[in-house]
Amino acid sequence: MLILSLLLSLSSPVHAAFPAPEKSTAPITIVFPAENSVLGPADAAWLIGNVSEPKGLFKINGETITVHPDGAWLAWVPVAPGTFTFSATLSVGTSFYAYQRVVDVLPPQAPLPAKPVAFDNDSLTPRADLELRPGDWLLTRAKVSPGAKPEFRLGRKGAWQPMREVVPALGIYEGAYLLRTEDETTGAPVQFRAQGHGGAAATAPGKVTVTRATPLVGVLRGQNVVMVRTGPGEGDLFPAIGGTRFVVGGRQGNELKLLLSNGQTGWIDGKTVEMLLPGAHPPRAETETVGVRSGERESTVRVGLGDRVPFIVEENEDLTAVTVRLHYTYLHTNWIVYPDNEDFVDEVRLKQETSDIVAMTVKLKPGKHLWGYWAGFEGNALKLELRKPPRLAKKGSPLSGVRVFLDPGHMPSAPGAIGPLGTKEMDINLAIAREAEALLKADGAVPILSRKDEKDEVSLVDRPKLAVEKKADVFVSVHNNFLPGSSNPFRGGPHGYSIFYYHPHSLELARAVYEGYHKRVPLSSEELRFGDYLVLRNPAMPAILTESAYLTYPEQEAMLLEEPFRKKLAAAIVDGLRAYFKDLRDQEKRR
């Protein structure tokens, strides 16, 4: 540790010294899992920690565990359901030390006993109250004793419906019923029954309302962006902006079902929506005059609508056009006005794509490509800002003058992953970002950090906002990785670096930085990846997220604690940025 401390003390003088982890002085330390943790159903679990004497004989539950020279260790230990104790021992000469860590291991899923016939009440769906309409499907699920042949019905007088076994080994069944007009009801239970050995009955916790009433109108509260999803708790469909109005045609618990145009549906957190009184006009927009305005950093397309309606923005494959699909909208545009000095937008086209969806496609001028965009409302008009690539220095470093937003992931209230020696991910991330900051400054770039020191608290939502406020050209979020709790750390590799992107206009930046890692970082590649991370969803600029190494592994934690390795990671990021902007500059020269 003395050598390591000396290395850390020699860090760059332009920054505060890297905060080395405070290694425990106890003979045995278990960093993860924490005392009384609940571990998922498994036959083994991994642990990390450290010992005070690396050359001692270290065991957990009688199995010898390999210890890294700095005292860190990683173990994969068999477990059993229920309260489980990890008993760790360390033998050093004539000295003997012992330490215990108690956890709760959930039992594996198993079928119910055949007798007496019973339902697993925790398996019954719907779990939450539902509001449905005729033509919707009522979907049910139940776990029941083997061979019981369960059925379900809506209400106490509904017809019994069959269920189909989908997981025979566990006795899990699913059922579906297409609701009809005559099923109209309020707060009806979903009941289950099963045959054999005395039979069994049960009722799902969620009640069902089936209504033919006119759908209500909801408006998104505030000015924040809220994600509309494909289903309750499912993937992203599109972001919606405060003031947007929707037709609401159902509910599942706290989630509202949105009836969009052309038969499409979406789901949104009900707490974010204000429901209007019955009789409120449904959302309806008509496209008015379209105006194009040229700016230094972006060109803006503005179209009057008369209402705030949902819209979905889509970039084309080669980033030469953007299409906005406006729901609940009807084409009524007579004029499209282009300024004399417009050098980015070539043409705007509108068409009635379906009966109530207008597609507005903005084509860029030949040789131009999209850098990023931002779409929002100005009153009841849609304002689409199309960002231009930054102007690059014609000579010297291609990074000269480029504004790079470096986002060291996590913060004191959410420190992220932790290593066997107690290394906090937030500290490593900041140290790498500081090294990248120094390299970028030396290359003439303008680095901007979301967190400048170890005490800074910057929320996840505020980080991309801050990048826009600071007029950044690119966004780089710096992270390190941690294994899922159920993974065997000694199988399923490789375990190394990975680079993530979200929007198509971020892909080339991700590729360039990935290549920088491939050339400089002596770890395995986990390849280039799409990642649905909040900080990457902001479409205003190319944005990527780096996962440099795994704090879980003692070898990789030790590497991250060494300044030369952190410099390599920073250099990989900057190499990628430099190559990306050099390619951009070369493309501009060829035009």
Regions found by a protein language model. Give the residues of each.
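Bacterial N-terminal signal peptides
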Residues: M1-S11
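Solvent-exposed loop/turn segments at secondary-structure junctions
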Residues: H410-S413, D453-E457, N480-G485, P504-L507, ...
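Active-site histidine-acidic residue metal-binding/catalytic motifs
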Residues: E385-L466, K470-V474, P484-S487, G493-H495, ...
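A short beta-strand segment in extracellular, disulfide-stabilized domains
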Residues: A44-N50, L139-R141
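Active-site-adjacent mobile loop/cap segments within catalytic or ligand-binding domains
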Residues: V474, P484-G485, S498-F500, E527-R591
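Active-site-adjacent substrate-binding region
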Residues: P504-R529, P539
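Short linear recognition/processing motifs and adjacent strand/loop elements at protein termini
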Residues: A17-S24, T66-F405, P412, A438, ...
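Soluble non-cytosolic domains of exported or imported proteins
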Residues: E234, A240, T423-A431, E454-V461, ...
